[in-house]
Structures are given as C-alpha cells and as structure tokens.
From Swiss-Prot:
Keywords carried by this UniProt record: Aminoacyl-tRNA synthetase, ATP-binding, Cytoplasm, Ligase, Nucleotide-binding, Protein biosynthesis
Enzyme Commission number, as recorded: 6.1.1.11
Record's keyword annotation contains Oxidoreductase: no
Taxonomic source organism: Nitrosococcus oceani (strain ATCC 19707 / BCRC 17464 / JCM 30415 / NCIMB 11848 / C-107)
GO biological process: selenocysteine biosynthetic process; seryl-tRNA aminoacylation
Lineage of producing organism: Bacteria, Pseudomonadati, Pseudomonadota, Gammaproteobacteria, Chromatiales
Protein name according to UniProt: Serine--tRNA ligase
Signal sequence region: none
InterPro entries: aa-tRNA-synt_IIb, aa-tRNA-synth_II, aa-tRNA-synth_II/BPL/LPL, Ser-tRNA-ligase_type_1, Ser-tRNA-synth_1_N, SerRS_1_N_sf, SerRS_core, tRNA-bd_arm
A GO MF term: ATP binding
One GO location term (cellular component): cytoplasm
List of residues binding ATP: R260, S261, E262, E347, I348, S349, S350
Pfam families for this protein: Seryl_tRNA_N (PF02403), tRNA-synt_2b (PF00587)
Function: Catalyzes the attachment of serine to tRNA(Ser). Is also able to aminoacylate tRNA(Sec) with serine, to form the misacylated tRNA L-seryl-tRNA(Sec), which will be further converted into selenocysteinyl-tRNA(Sec).
Length: 427
C-alpha cells in the first residue's frame, strides 16, 4: 500500500508516477472522498467535544438539584448525530481503503520507462549458450524417454500438470536440496516450513488480493487459498510485529509447491513445463531496514544468480520496465535462462524490492534505534530458483545427441554419484 500522505499531499505527482506503469485511476473520486473524510473527522471531533462539555454541565446541574431533563434530551440528540457522522465516516474510510488496496507501488527512479517486456533493459549476461553439434530438442521431446509424462498428468488432473517418474523425479528433488543447501550454508538464509494454504488477510498483505483473485485457487467455503508463491506465508511471518533492530535483516528461504490458475494465459506456453498450475519454487525473502534495501536487492539477486552459475546455466539479468512490474514491486530484476530447445532466454527468477509497500499492508515495523520509534520495514523476495524451469533448463543445456542428459558435477552428490541420465523406453 502506498503511503496515504503521498495521495493526500502530492496527488498530481503520484498520479504521474503511477502513469509510468500504465496505471490509470479516478484521482478526482479519491480527492472527493478524502475531502469528505476530513470533513467527517472534524465534525466527529467537534461533536465529541460538545458531548464531553454537556456531560460536565449535566454533572454540575445534577449536583445542584436542577432539572436535567432538557440537558439529557440535548445529550441524546448529540449522541444520535455523532453516531450518524461516525457511521458515514466509517463508510468513507472503507471506500478509501478499497481504493488504496487497488493502487500499485510506484516505480523506482532506476526502473526504465516502457510498456511491456519488449522494453525491459538487459543489465548483464553470464555464460555462453552451448554450441551443440546437433539440432537441440526441447525438454518435452527429451523428457518423453526420461520419465516426463504429460498424458498421465492430464488423466490425473488436467492440462498444465506433469508427472515425473524415476531419474527426473530424483533430479527435481536434488535441485531443491542443492538450492536450499547453498542458500542456508553460504548465503545466510534461515530455512522455514510454512502452510501451503493461506487466508485472505495474508494474500491482501502481499498484494495478490483483492486485485488478482482470478489467478488464485480458492478452497470453497473455507476462506483459504492455495499459495501462488511462498512469498505469501513467509512475508506474513512478521505481520503485525514491531521488530527489534538487532533482529534485522531477516533472511528466510522456503521450498513450497505453488498453485496458479493462469487466468489470462490461455494459449500461452501450452507445451511443456514452462507454465503450470502446480510447480515448485525455492523462495528467498528478506525483511530489512529501509536504508539497506537497495543493496539487499542487489545481494538477493546475486544469490539467485549463484545457483545458475553453480549449475553452469547461461542467463541474462533484465531490469523490468515500469509497465512490466508486478503490482507490489518498485524495482524488479528478472533472471532469464537460455533454453536451446527454444533458442531463447526465459524467465527463471524474479527478484523484487517492494520498499514499504507490503509492510504497510501487513503492518510490519521495526524500532528505529535512531528515533526509538516504530518505522516501516522494507520487504524483498525472489525465486532462488523456480525448480521446474531449472530442471528443463538443465535438460536442454546438458543434452547429448543420443537424448541422454549430463548431470553437472555440483549436483552429482545429490544424485548418488550419477553423472548421466540415460533415456529408456517405458513399457
């Protein structure tokens, strides 16, 4: 949530900044509601003051034995008027809150202008795409003889699901363990296990609700949703807290399944594991003091990059333009891995700095040692990495002419020493 003061005191400038990301809204309606809120608040305060004054007068009159019936009638009338004004104020505040929850974060000054992914700016590249001496297959063709089964998944659940059997399932698990080990042992993250069902308040807190409900799987008649990312429960670990300065930064890592309806993605990436209803991620979340969040963003991005580098997967880092930012993000780096089967780079991680946008929604603060007063923390998160996409990137980049897949040395200890996955015909 944006600081309401920005909208109250700098409405025109804030509206211009929101326009950078293509967001249009009824600023005039907000201004009208805000004026009414101020009027109702002043009226409420005046009526409360009058009621308090009348209460004292009634007390004195009663002590002196005077007739207080007229004063009581006036007090009742004041009380009724106050209730009416307070009820209207509550309605106006709820309308303003609804508007605020639907406004995205402001793009950072270093976020490039642009409308969509075509305007994203490349920051750097790492690695060289493999020079294969044969026509590379994509992960679907490779996986057909390695235990990647989409047809069975359709029978079990429907489209946009997959089953992995045998060595590919083991490789999938190995990637998860490898990522967790690197992040906990080398990058200083604390591993957490969280629920895979989240309540509405949690999803409002991180910004998925109320705007993106159609993209979520809701559990009917329960108030629960399947989590679209571990960002939701992990960030909400500090909801409603005032953290001591010595606890910061908090660095959490969690492996969870993620569930997304992919509403609005009809016809996109229908082949393979690129866009699934259910997929696994290892998620990085940081809760930090405001003055270090910019550096924390660079560090977190580097932590995700380290996994790709250890696996020897070529990638590039993209600074997302304002029009391509996620709802809650102020600045985002996308890591895009090279896929020989598609002859292009595809997103494998998004690393974002939300500043105090999520913190305001979840009421997460820290006690600033300089002022000894509570202040908003900054929140950041990124995938470290998306496991399914890492799996298919390994398959495509390490494929051999016979359809076998070489296992990077760094993963071989997690695979019981296996160095090559050999294709086999399933009967």
């Amino acid at each position: 949530m944006l600081d309401p003061k920005l909208l109250r005191n700098a409405l025109a400038d804030t509206t211009r900044q929101l326009a950078r990301r293509g967001f249009e809204w009824d600023a005039a309606a907000f201004a009208t509601l805000e004026a009414e809120r101020k009027e109702m608040q002043v009226c409420t305060q005046e009526l409360q003051a009058k009621r308090n004054a009348r209460s004292k007068i009634i007390g004195k009159a009663k002590a002196q034995g005077e007739d207080i019936a007229p004063l009581l009638a006036e007090m009742t009338e004041l009380g009724d008027h106050l209730k009416t004004v307070e009820a209207r104020l509550e309605v106006v505040q709820a309308q303003i809150e609804e508007i605020l929850l639907g406004i995205p974060n402001l793009p950072d000054a270093s976020t490039p202008p642009g409308k969509d992914e075509q305007d994203n700016v490349e920051v750097r590249r790492w690695g060289t795409p493999p020079a294969l001496e044969f026509v590379p297959k994509d992960h679907v063709d490779l996986g057909a003889s390695l235990g990647m089964d989409f047809e069975t998944a359709v029978k079990l659940s429907g489209t946009r699901f997959v089953t992995l059997i045998g060595p590919l399932a083991q490789l999938h698990r190995a990637l998860i363990q490898f990522m967790l080990d690197v992040h906990t042992r080398e990058h200083g993250y604390t591993e957490v296990y969280v629920p895979y069902l989240a309540n509405r308040e949690s999803l409002v807190g991180t910004g998925q609700l109320p705007k993106f409900e159609e993209g979520l799987f809701a559990i009917r008649d329960t108030g629960y949703y399947l989590i679209p990312t571990a960002e939701v429960p992990v960030t909400n670990l500090v909801r409603g807290e005032i953290l001591l300065a010595e606890r910061l930064p908090l660095k959490y890592v969690a492996h969870t399944p993620c569930f997304r309806s992919e509403a609005g993605s009809y016809g996109k990436d229908t082949r393979g594991m690129i866009r699934q209803h259910q997929f696994e991620k290892v998620e990085l979340v940081q809760i930090v003091p405001p003055e270090v969040s910019q550096q924390a963003h660079e560090d977190l991005t580097g932590h995700a990059e380290a996994i790709l580098q250890r696996l020897g997967l070529p990638y590039r880092v993209m600074n997302l333009c304002a029009g391509d930012l996620g709802f809650a993000s102020s600045k985002t780096y996308d890591l895009e891995v090279w896929l020989p089967g598609q002859q292009t780079y595809r997103e494998i991680s998004s690393c974002s700095n939300f500043l105090d946008f999520q913190a305001r929604r979840i009421q997460a603060r820290w006690r600033d040692p300089k002022t000894q007063k509570p202040a908003w923390v900054h929140t950041l998160n990124g995938s470290g990495l998306a496991v399914g996409r890492t799996l298919l990137a390994l398959m495509e980049n390490y494929q051999q002419a016979d359809g076998s897949i070489r296992i990077p040395e760094t993963l071989q200890p997690y695979m019981g020493g296996v160095s090559v996955l050999q294709p086999s015909i399933r009967g």
